[in-house]
Structures are given as structure tokens and as C-alpha cells.
Amino acid sequence: KKGKKKWPQTHIDNAKEAEAAYQAGIEIISCEPDHHFKEVRKLAPTAFLSVGLRHGYVSSPQEAIKYGFEILEMGADAVYCSHSIYFIEAMAKEGIPITSHVGLVPNLSTWTNFRAVGKTAEEALQVCQKVKDLENAGAACVEVEVVPIEVADHITKNTKMITMGMGC
């Protein structure tokens, strides 16, 4: 049942890290769609792999759809996307499972300056609204990074998406 089981997750940078994570029982792995990815999938055959669509790598929702399908064809279970709602909605409408992101989003860190997000009531409401917008756009998962635990708990209880907490 949602919110009852916690699944260990990590981000890996190479195949050896993927193998070590998988052998340690880590069930959710995120990685980049680089030359190591096919080996990562081979070494972690049943792990849930969320593979990143680099922010700015594509310039239109149509390019994102094409690239998303390429990532899925390589063996990903979901495509990580921190692009705008328009990109996420277009990809989701085509059946691409999307892992979205709220809170501290490193590639958008100029907005947050690498700090916890959601500590004020106004910011917490903005984070929660962003989650609802992502859910309405069709995202399957949301990575909630460096937000207060109370905000993360509220998000988990009030969305149908899979929530992945980092630093919460």
C-alpha cells in the first residue's frame, strides 16, 4: 500500500556502482543514458531504472518524446524529466512513464541556491501545487528532494504518483 513500504534508491554513475547497489538490495536506481546504461540494465535486471533526460538536451516536447522512447528501448522503466509541464504532459500522453522532480532540483539550482525548499508556508504551498500540476500532466513518479519531512509526508499522502524522497 502507498506510503507503507520504503524502497531504497540511489543514483549511480557507472556499471560497477549499479552492480553493487543491486547486490545490496537497492531496488530503485537512477542513472544517465550514457554508454554504461546497457551494462547497468544487465547488472541490475529487476531494479526499477529511472534514466535521466538531461535538462536542455532537447528543445521541444516532440524531441523529448523521441528521446524518451529511445531511453525506454534501451531498458529504462521510467524517464527522469525536470523539463516544463508541457514536456512532461506530451511525453506522458504518448505512454512514457515520467519521473518528475520538486524541491531542490540541482539543474535548476539558480532558483533555489542549493537549499531546502518548502520551509515557509508559501514555499510549501508552491511545492505542493507543483506536485499536483505534475500529477495532472501525467507524471508517474515525483522525486521530492530536500523539503521538510512534513511537506514530503503531505505530498505522499495526497498524490497518486510514486514519491521518491531524497534528503527529506
Q: Could you say what each language-model-derived stretch is?
A:
Residues 1-168:
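Alpha/beta enzyme core
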